Amino acid sequence: ITSSSGNWSYAGGGTKYAAALLSTWCGPVKSDKAYNVNGWSNAAYKLESAISVDGKNLNKDAAAREKMKRAIVKYGAVTFSYNNVREAYYYNPSEESGSSPHACTIIGWDDTIPAENFYPSKTTTDGGWLVKNSYSSLPYFYLSYEVTCEQIYAFDYVMNDKYDNNYFYDASATDSGIGSLLKIKQAANVFKVKGDTENEWIKAVGVGIVGENTDCTVEVYSDVQDGSFNPQNAKLETTKTVYLEYGGFNCIELDKPVEVKKGSTFAVVVKVNNAYITLSENEGESYVYRGGWTPSQAVRIKVFTKNDEKNQNSIEFMDEGQVKVRGNGGIKQLIITMSENEELKDFYVESINFDENKEKIVTLPSGWIRIENIRYKAFLWDNFENISPECSEIEW
């Protein structure tokens, strides 16, 4: 079952289906839970991204393999499927017949394995992927670089308390064929704030795309009129442009959360230039731009929000070397690190009492100015013992 006409959450057979389901925050569920528990209410974590690596040239293109390696380093592992016939520690099944798809996880690689080590098909390329298998009889093995890999995904999760709500319309495991036919580069979803008792804060936007190496622009609008969408009739709250190296489902965190009022209607527009936005097979208040905004099948655009942040902890980098910190009470430690190429260069610590004032502007020492290729991370800790639920990590 892969569409909204049945229970599509039972869809199986590939990591692409898993990515679509996990992006709705159904699962993952810890192994000590019963197999039939509700995946949404028992999710151990929330998925932010499920990026897709193009595997069609991995068996013949060194540059494609380097891109795969970067994904493994960034996300820790990638899932994939290949045609499997037998078990072998150095395996190359590329010329075997009677094989069937088998899903595994790649956790590393070794470029120095001699080609002649791989069995049974002949191999001319040295090196292979280190695979974590699901078979206890062969828990780990090396798969030749010359093997064709499919449905390659890396999943990135966050703690459950980072977001409270996930707004979306797409509810199918498979993409709509119309999306691939039209190759939509601009799309929008319009949502009404779910809660009627408190405001919410939009913190991130997720989008499903086919393609890679693309610029992606996200725009958030408030004061949207019910029943239609036209950016000219709404208020632009924020915009952010990022570069996406991989396809699949990417999460774009906003530089500053956008407050949306209870009961109000908001919209999110996504634009890409070297890819296209995917659609699902069901309906929603979605729009695509083709010379004008027209209603469409549900686009795979999701919005992650946090309930009213007035009582939450948050950190915001400002200009002129300042940081705005909001706390929900008590004494907390603000820690800011400066790094270059993942190497720690400097750090700053300040103790802040939020009992008297819930918000404070912290001015950093001289030298803490915007520098190209320098990454800043900010954390809010409770007395160095427990990390705050709203720990922020923001590029500045």
Model-derived features with residue positions:
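Predominantly the structural core of cysteine protease catalytic domains
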Residues: I1-G128, K132-E212, Y243-G247, K261-G263
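Structural beta-strand segments of beta-rich domains
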Residues: W201-K203, D319-V323
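Short acidic/polar inter-strand loop motif in beta-rich domains
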Residues: V272-L279, D382-C391
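Short, aromatic- and glycine-rich surface loops/edge beta-strands on solvent-exposed regions
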Residues: F266-V270, R370-E385
